[in-house]
């Protein structure tokens, strides 16, 4: 049973990200400086983040629908692009391996991959889909060793569901125009 207010935590983290971006712990340290004094512990932020990531696709779809009531969207054209975030760490994240079977259960997000700056640091890739006005519709996060080419179609399928199957023109730079992406978009 959840004993804290998820909406309160989400609201506080959103305000804090806009006003004074910090780590979750750094943000929690500023809790008493806000006019509205939230009533939750640091552990509740971490538990909320687990809930948020487990429901991220549904949450992003909900955000799109709610924000569409405030700012009408023009989804006749959808823009997609990817970027990388570098981390000043010595090595990539470890794989999580099943101790019994030896099976790799998951790979950490920070991995060595191709970055435009050719830096020797692990990276995380983010893909973002925006409407014709440049307002985000959805996003995805991937390990840095994943090609951006394989991220477009799954995110586009999610956007198609969010838009209830509405037609739109897919627009991306040449790096995101592989045969498989063009084939998917030509199928209507």
Annotated model-derived regions:
Residues 1-108, 120, 127-140, 145, ...:
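Dynamic "connector" segments at or just before major functional cores
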Residues 113-117:
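Conserved beta-alpha junction segments in alpha/beta enzyme cores
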Residues 123-125, 179:
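Short beta-strand-initiation
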Residues 148-188:
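An internal, acidic/charged active-site-proximal segment
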């Amino acid at each position: 049973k959840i004993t804290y207010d998820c909406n309160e935590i989400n609201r506080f983290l959103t305000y804090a990200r806009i006003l004074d971006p910090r780590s979750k712990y750094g943000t929690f340290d500023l809790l008493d400086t806000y006019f509205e004094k939230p009533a939750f512990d640091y552990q509740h932020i971490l538990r909320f983040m687990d809930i948020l990531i487990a429901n991220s696709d549904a949450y992003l779809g909900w955000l799109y629908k709610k924000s569409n009531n405030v700012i009408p969207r023009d989804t006749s054209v959808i823009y997609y692009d990817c970027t990388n975030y570098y981390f000043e760490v010595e090595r990539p994240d470890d794989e999580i391996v099943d101790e019994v079977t030896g099976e790799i259960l998951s790979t950490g997000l920070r991995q060595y991959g191709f970055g435009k700056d050719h830096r020797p640091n692990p990276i995380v890739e983010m893909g973002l889909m925006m409407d014709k006005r440049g307002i985000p519709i959805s996003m995805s996060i991937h390990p840095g060793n994943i090609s951006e080419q394989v991220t477009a179609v799954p995110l586009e399928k999610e956007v198609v569901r969010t838009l209830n199957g509405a037609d739109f023109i897919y627009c991306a730079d040449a790096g995101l125009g592989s045969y498989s992406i063009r084939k998917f978009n030509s199928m209507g």
